[in-house]
Amino acid sequence: DLLSRVLAKLLISAFAPTGIIYLAVDDTLCRKRGLTVYGTGMHHDPLISSRAKPLVSWGHDWVVLTLIVVGPFWSPSKVWSLPIGFRLYRNRQGLTKGKKGRKAKTKRRNPNHRTRPELAVELISLVAGWFPERTFVISAFPLVLGIARSTNPRSPTCSLRYGV
């Protein structure tokens, strides 16, 4: 969190020193090989999936909070999304069906396990706590918006929108 805080303060002071801070949050799959890589698992892969056939890939699933920069001086006609916070999503292993179709033994839910939307709300709350006097407009996937509205991020001036 220290790296994220330093990066957020640096980027926000450079690109949004006053006014509204525009943020976006989403998750991304980074494919990795090897069973010994920490934090990897089988995750839904939207790039190779279709509506008819959902597919999965082995890798890291990162939840990333980004600062939206519209028309910076080096690229006035573009919109940039600069990462300022991140969390590694780790799925619950062992609760899926095996090759023979038998349901795995259900384990107790790990109280430390957090879903992607919970991680996104955690990132939003963290950044809102660093800049309590600022107003945020956050673009996120719908489930994050529902959780964020029910848990109220720290900043009372936080507007949530779906899509950019």
Regions found by a protein language model. Give the residues of each.
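Conserved, well-structured functional cores that handle cations and Mg-NTP chemistry
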Residues: D1-V164
